[in-house]
Amino acid sequence: MRELRHSSKSGAGHHTNAPCPIHSPFFWRMGGIPRILTGICSSTALLALTLLAGCKPVGPNYSRPGYDAPAAYKETGATTVVPPPAPAGGGWQPASPSDGMLRGKWWEIYQDPQLNQLEDRIAAENPTLRQALETYLAARDQVSAARAAFYPTLSAGASATREEISANGPNYSPGKSTTYSDFAVSGQASWEPDFWGRIRRTVEAARSNAQASAADQANIDLSLHAEMAADYFQLRGLDAEIALLNSTVIDLENQLDLTQRRLSGGIGTEADVAQARTQLETVRAQRVDVGVARAQYEHAIGTIANLKLSDFSIPFSPLAQTAGLALPKVPVGVPSQLLERRPDIAAAERRAAAANAQIGIAVSAFYPNINLTGTGGFESMNVGTLIQGPSALWSLGAQATELLFDAGQRHALTDAARHTYEAQAAAYRSTILSAFNDVEDQISGLRILEQESAVEQRAVDAAQNSYDISNQRYKGGVTSYLEVLTAEATLLQNQRTAIDLQTRQFVSSVGLVRSLGGGWDANQLPK
């Protein structure tokens, strides 16, 4: 490499035969622009950091809005709710604010392999959940963007200019050339020390919003899994109804054959045959109607799992006959735990925290804006002498500006931020109230459905006995076929009601799990 040589006889505009100045050994001994900028920033940054260490951010520090949770749920006094044994592969565990362990898959407490398989597809395939994930990732990136304001901004530039001045202008000097060149390379640094905490409050708000977004994602995940389980049990309940209607159709076909044989034997009537045929076709129509509802639930399940509906089907399996399926007991815990277990409550609380940070941002506008700047580089009329000591230049500066009059704008923005916080705090308390109401509804619903199911089963037994007696009486010629039809219709209605109650118990059980937050707790929020 040829060294750059400088002749004292040559002026700044004299061109020398030299390599690119960036390759000059002198440039690298000087450290180039990075070292110049480092020197510029170090002294000012050290002073600013020393001052920042003792500065607290303006605005109120956040504390969670208060809420007095009851000691126990009202409806738990009327039912026994105990934790079930954990199923193989992990099960739903009662959450605790101090327990940050990842919970198992709560739907496994129902011990249904088909349901487990469908639920597992949600995390990998559901586009709604993917949308929520991307929303959270965008909010997390906003935190990184806000944190970047803690650091200086650095920029660099280079310029080359060839200019001719007017010989008749004020800058003309007789005897000197009117044409000259100007070459420059420089770097700039700018830093806003966070004396008043505006940046810290901005990061605080961004972090709280990101946590709220993460809680939203968890809430969507919980809702999708709960909807999948509820739809699945509805479908299995319809399978049970279809199985019942199938057996009823067979029974009614036998009854129709009996009435026809009795008519042929001269001991029956055409009215009996017509009534039997009417009852048979009515039940067949009911079976078709239930099949339509089943198809709709199958479509809903396939949509949640993001499956092609043309290739998707769920095998027929009546609810009461599904292997291993049993209604589990769901651990409820105490109301104070609900504040940590429901993601929608956590999301509302984090938005209140973000709104509180916005107050500090608004208050910081009442304080001066302070900015530290530095520039360093080289400038020369000769590219050959550009990267040399005499060509170096630098500047350091500090700027402070204070807004003296804004017609009350800052006061209005601060008041608006305070009202926004109060609104978010109220929304947080409202979410808690709705959550407690939801839990109480689900607990009472399960208890009442259990009682109703027991009563309905007695009604089914009585209706079955009535039908058996009426059928025997008809076969013995003691009564008309109308009595048999009435008893059979009553039996079928009670049997369908019993199936519906069983289905609703499973759906309500899922609703209770959902109202309790599933296996989630606030310790799973990103920090």
For the regions a language model picked out, list residue spans one by one.
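Sec/SRP-type N-terminal targeting helices
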Residues: R130-Q131, R147-A148, P193-D221, A271, ...
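Periplasmic alpha-helical coiled-coil/stalk elements that build and connect Gram-negative outer-membrane
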Residues: I199, A215-V334, G445, L449, ...
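Glycine-centered motif in EGF-like
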Residues: G31-G32
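Structural signature of outer-membrane beta-barrel domains
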Residues: T161-I165, I304, G377-M381
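Terminal intrinsically disordered/low-complexity segments used for targeting and assembly
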Residues: L49-A124, F183, R207, G291-E340, ...
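Bacterial N-terminal signal peptides
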Residues: G39-A53
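A short glycine-centered flexible hinge/capping loop motif at secondary-structure junctions
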Residues: L263-I267, Y474-V478, S515-G519
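Short flexible linkers and secondary-structure junctions
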Residues: K56-E227, N369-G374, L404-T414, Y421
